[in-house]
Amino acid sequence: MVGYSLALGFPLGVSGGILEGLQRFYLMNWTNIVGTLARAVLIIYVLRHGLGLLSVALITVTLPLITAAVRAMIAQRLLTIPYGWKYVDRGSLRQVANYGSVTFMIIVAARMRFKSDAVIIGSFLSAAAITHFSIGARLVDYAGEVVSSLAQIFTPMSSHFHATGDFKQLRRIFITGNRACALVMFPMTVALIIMGKSVIEAWMGARYVITSYPVLLILLIPSTIYQAQSTSNRMLFGMSLHKALAYVALMEGVSNVALSIFLVRPLGIVGDAIGTAIPLACTALFFLPRHMCRQLGISIREFVYECYFYPAVLTAPMIAVLILMQHRFYAHRYPQLVLNLAAGIAAYGVGVGWYVLTRESFGIQLKDRFSRFVSGQVGPAEQ
């Protein structure tokens, strides 16, 4: 089943790229939402009726293919693309091959970065240790996946403006996009740092906290720095300037494996986490911001201030609220965990609302429209 899924997934995946290139993100989102909900409902149905893991696997493999097929039909309707060997252009094929080979290098490097840990830990420690490592690492992955999904839209946008030579818009995407990524990533980081022990206890049990929480902290900080620059990453793909990123990512992946092997014996799973964190931090701190700022003609100081000053400041109320809630009502189970997180999110939401309405142009315009609407309603009533 997995083999058939891979074989069909490659050609069907082109349709998703077409929709992204056309900037029809709402179609991508709706197909994702419907496909995910359908998969969840079917899996629950199968498990409740005792149909076995094979049925679950069939649903898990089939639903993404159906979603991709629906996207292919939508893309065909939008573009009415003709098919045939006479439409194959060698120059375009060469361009796609060059772009794809560099992208493949980055994919391989990403697998070395995040997927090699289980092999190393299983080889040098034990299979049981993989579970303790994976709990902390998976929480970091969940947070990063949210931001990565958000940043997907910047690839076709940056490709469009780079093709037209509009560097002013590219700089605007660079600043506002990374700021948006930080506004999403920073509160998740704060929540995991302060409430990570409670999350692990409620999710997996108290016995995993002492081993998994240090892994979470070690991986979370460099991952936050990297994910807060997700727009930079996607823009490099959009502008087809990701070759340097590919070489750096490969060096990072090799360094990750080497350091993890070197440190896993004396330090255990913490050593493996350190071996992953150090190369990732170097990429996020020393390569990615400098490379992007050089490409777009922006100073590092301007980049850091414009993208990260307000997102960092706005987390202060959330930090205070979460620390207070954890001190007064420490969360051991999901209900209290949700309550504490809701209080922290509410505090952060107030700050973000203030920022949007006073600092962002569309928020200021929205506030002005609302003020005019209210004054227009009050005026006639008073008359």
Task: Give the ranges of each region predicted by the language model.
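Helix-loop junctions and terminal segments of transmembrane helices
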Residues: 20-21, 79-80, 136, 140-178, ...
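Membrane-proximal transmembrane or re-entrant/amphipathic helices at the cytosolic face
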Residues: 298-300, 322-383
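Helix-terminus/linker motif at the lipid-water interface of multi-pass membrane proteins
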Residues: 45-50, 104, 111-142, 160-161, ...
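Alpha-helical transmembrane segments of polytopic membrane transporters and translocases
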Residues: 4-5, 65-66, 102, 117-119, ...
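Hydrophobic alpha-helical transmembrane segments
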Residues: 29-78, 99, 250-258, 269-291, ...
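Interhelical loop/hinge segments that connect adjacent transmembrane helices in multipass membrane
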Residues: 53-57, 71-114, 153, 157, ...
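Interfacial segments at transmembrane-helix termini and the short loops linking adjacent helices
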Residues: 1-2, 192-223, 296, 330-331
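Membrane-interface junctions at transmembrane-helix termini in multi-pass inner-membrane proteins
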Residues: 4-32, 51-54, 75, 220-251, ...
